Amino acid sequence: MAAEATAVAGSGAVGGCLAKDGLQQSKCPDTTPKRRRASSLSRDAERRAYQWCREYLGGAWRRVQPEELRVYPVSGGLSNLLFRCSLPDHLPSVGEEPREVLLRLYGAILQGVDSLVLESVMFAILAERSLGPQLYGVFPEGRLEQYIPSRPLKTQELREPVLSAAIATKMAQFHGMEMPFTKEPHWLFGTMERYLKQIQDLPPTGLPEMNLLEMYSLKDEMGNLRKLLESTPSPVVFCHNDIQEGNILLLSEPENADSLMLVDFEYSSYNYRGFDIGNHFCEWVYDYTHEEWPFYKARPTDYPTQEQQLHFIRHYLAEAKKGETLSQEEQRKLEEDLLVEVSRYALASHFFWGLWSILQASMSTIEFGYLDYAQSRFQFYFQQKGQLTSVHSSS
């Protein structure tokens, strides 16, 4: 989910109030003045950016004057702040140092120091395998990465058949990797349990949105979700866990026919396959590029249809099962089972990012309607859960 963002789950309109029992929006007083997202580097951060580039990149970066360093905000994350740092044109390169880099400054740290270390190791491994940007520097506040001429996909592009097929293939390749991390799938519920505990420990704020835990009985509901997923077979693979449009780059100068690159691996871990696919389908609904509060839109009707899901699943299986010969019956069974698996794990996506967003609201300095977003995700969770129950009851 970590991208840029606007409105709550509804018909696509921006703003409005949420009803507790559905995704419909009702008209409510415009008590929040319109404001646009601000994204700039403070004087102190500019000074530190200059120092980091000098120390970690060397070459011409050691000769650039502070006032010559070009620093531009990059549309990026709800977890991190991203900036493009460039050398001035008149300053020649000394060696092989890059002329521009991406500076990533960590936002509110929810994973802990150990997870940041693992992410840096993971980032370096993927770079060595040419599956991600190069890593130029790591420091407590963030890191310097290769700046890749590209643009992130747009939410509406996720539904384009050619791009959807390419994303499915890319995801299957990612799932096929062997990584030097624990293969036990503790990440999903381990992280959600930690988030829930942290939320319960938050001091009272008086904000009605912070009563989401009680409103939805989230502690009990997590137990219900766990039981459902324990009865849902899903292989454990190396998952990205956040394949949304902002984390999929369309390369401007691809070195081969593969024009897409996955980025932002901070949530990657061994996890259940169904979560990665279900999470991606949920992201068809959310557009994080809106420039006014609450900086996201939600269009529940954009959730992929069964036909669109099958299109994705067939291309995923074509890559994951490459070299295997399957009968038509075996292929059909795989597709049907995966549809059920993904629809159930999509619930976990809503639950995970809903908890994440409540926590972010309490600590993040990034402008985003985190509490609105949390409520949207939980409402969508209960709507989709109800649909699953209806299908099960009628079958």
From Swiss-Prot:
Listed result of changing residue 377 to L: In MDCMC; decreased choline kinase activity
Chain positions recorded as ATP binding sites: 75-81, 104, 146-152, 244, 264
Superkingdom of origin organism: Eukaryota
Any one GO cellular component localisation term in the record: cytoplasm
Catalytic activity: choline + ATP = phosphocholine + ADP + H(+); ethanolamine + ATP = phosphoethanolamine + ADP + H(+)
Coiled-coil zones: none
Pathway: Phospholipid metabolism; phosphatidylethanolamine biosynthesis; phosphatidylethanolamine from ethanolamine: step 1/3
UniProt GO MF annotations: ATP binding; choline kinase activity; ethanolamine kinase activity
InterPro entries per the UniProt record, alphabetical: Kinase-like_dom_sf (IPR011009)
Catalytic class of the enzyme: transferase
One Pfam family in the UniProt entry: Choline_kinase
Modified residues (N-acetylalanine): 2
Gene Ontology biological process: CDP-choline pathway; muscle organ development; phosphatidylethanolamine biosynthetic process
UniProt keywords, alphabetically: Acetylation, ATP-binding, Congenital muscular dystrophy, Disease variant, Kinase, Lipid biosynthesis, Lipid metabolism, Nucleotide-binding, Phospholipid biosynthesis, Phospholipid metabolism, Transferase
EC number in record: 2.7.1.32, 2.7.1.82
Binding-site list for phosphocholine: 77-79
Disorder cited: Muscular dystrophy, congenital, megaconial type: An autosomal recessive, congenital muscular dystrophy characterized by early-onset muscle wasting, intellectual disability, and dilated cardiomyopathy in half of affected individuals. Some patients may die from cardiomyopathy in the first or second decade of life. Muscle biopsy shows peculiar enlarged mitochondria that are prevalent toward the periphery of the fibers but are sparse in the center.
Function: Has a key role in phospholipid metabolism, and catalyzes the first step of phosphatidylethanolamine and phosphatidylcholine biosynthesis.
Family per record: Belongs to the choline/ethanolamine kinase family.
Other information: This protein is produced by a bicistronic gene which also produces the CPT1B protein from a non-overlapping reading frame.
Subunit structure: Homodimer, and heterodimer with CHKA.
Name of the protein in question: Choline/ethanolamine kinase
Gene field: CHKB
